[in-house]
Amino acid sequence: MNQPIAPAPVPNRFAALLARAGLDWFLLALFGVVALAYFLPDLGSKASPVPWKLITTVGVALVFFFYGLKLSLEKLRAGMRNWKLHLLVQATTFVLFPLLALLVRPFFGPEKGELLWQSIFFLCALPSTVSTSVVMVSIARGNMPAAIFNASISSLLGIVLTPLLASLFLHLSADSSQLWGLAVQLLWQVVLPVGAGVLLNSRFNAFAERHKSKLRTFDQVTILLIVFTAFCESFAEGIFSSYRPADVFKLGAGMVGLYIIIVALIWALSRVLNFPRADKIVAVFCGSKKSLVHGSVMASLLFPASAATGLILLPLMLYHALQIVLASSMAQWLGRQPEAQVAAA
């Protein structure tokens, strides 16, 4: 007697649609925790019995320790030679982005406008992503060693340059003792964990590679906790009460404009420098990205007692979502184009 044939599994159309759009569970969870913070602000605020500060502090240190553990020094050495490309990417990340933020400063009014501008400048002072940049370059068939080098170096430079730019232009504190305290906190939570990870890299890099997906999930969960507690504090203190939905929409439109301007400028400079196709792709994808990992942890370090940290993170969250959607679409398009056509563009 014939056994009944089991029905074929129905494909998850929603998941497939999200994947084609460049979205994943983390991006949805990111906005989900903001919604949760809106409805339950006391759960993640300072008044909560849960020791969120201790949890996120340990999480930040572990994120940077695992980053050092995963850092491939051999791949970094392999990508060092193309200095013009590296200079363009790092100058875009830490010079061009902040300059654009400074140029639009006169358009922001006092009080709430100033705080919104500070959040945009903070975004512009951040380093590039590592994993997303490299994945996009791979899809677009770019120079992988150069992508790994630039994304990794950008993250390392960001440990120093992001706090430096923030202290110069955001006037974090005029009190030298508080600035010294910030330096010590950065040393303990960022520099030393990265250094420890690099020192143990040769012995435990294989372990980090085997558990790469789990470590990535740990990074993402840490970010979600930081974002949740930041927005809980902001909602509890009424930071967003003076902002309308139209303000958020304008901010989102501004992030789209920022991304398009940056990509256009990088592509134009790549043509002027006569980069080959593979290097143009690296310049565009590594130079236009901003790291949500670094942004979240740096915000928790640079604005530890501020109820406005949620607002500080808002442009970064919007830009992060846009860069994933727009960059994934662009990477897939470039990956399908003949090399000669992209090189001539």
Go through the PLM ranges and name each one.
Residues 211-218, 275-291, 297-298:
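Helix-helix packing/entry segments at the starts of transmembrane helices
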Residues 46-47, 238-245, 299-317:
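Extracellular/periplasmic helix-loop-helix junctions in multi-pass membrane proteins
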Residues 2-111, 167, 171-277, 338, ...:
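Structural signature of multi-pass alpha-helical membrane transport proteins
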Residues 83-90, 111-125, 142-152, 249-252, ...:
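The feature identifies polytopic integral membrane transport proteins across all domains of life
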Residues 305-307, 320-322, 338-345:
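Long, low-complexity C-terminal extensions of enzymes
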Residues 105-161, 170-182:
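Membrane-interface helix-loop-helix junctions at boundaries between adjacent transmembrane segments
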Residues 78-79, 131-143, 242, 268-271, ...:
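Helix-loop junctions at the membrane interface of multi-pass solute transporters
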Residues 28, 92-100, 125-130, 147-168, ...:
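Membrane-embedded alpha-helical segments of transport systems
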